[in-house]
Amino acid sequence: MNEQEFLAAMASADVIHDQAAIDAALDRMASELDALVGGGPIVYAVVLTGGLVVAGQLATRLRCELDFDYVHVSRYRGETQGSDRLDWICGPRLDWRDRDVVLVDDILDEGHTLSALIDAAHQRGARSVRLVTLCEKLHDRRVANLHADVVGLTVPDRFVFGYGMDAYERGRQLPGIYALAEG
């Protein structure tokens, strides 16, 4: 998608959540996560690239001690539908053995990527693994028994972007959550 096509898609996109709704959700998420993990320290692992915006904004609201880490995996590679293949671009840099790990991502959709990351965290010896997502998509296609421990907002079963989520690798920096026009 070139710049003109993205701007056209943006012009017809629906606003799902504005910045005020996101800020309120992040405040609530921080309180919930602080209550779940106590004082820390926790491994605060950002799921790149989508989780970057959310994790940064959420971190400034947390009171617990954070040891920052990141993982970079992808099933999408610029497409709107994920493949069955999980590409590990960069694994964690910290040792997760006997640590409480919190994975932070932009959205819980079907959950294949996040489920694989949770399994990988357990294989690396994590004492506990929590999942935090800004958004949870409302549908019935999720991986069985997968849920986020902390969720900020729900979004409809549409292609959403903004606040870390992209539409054809564009729009991650937008200060709201949008959905591509249907049809």
Predicted regions and their residues:
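PRPP-associated nucleotide enzymes
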Residues: 1-183
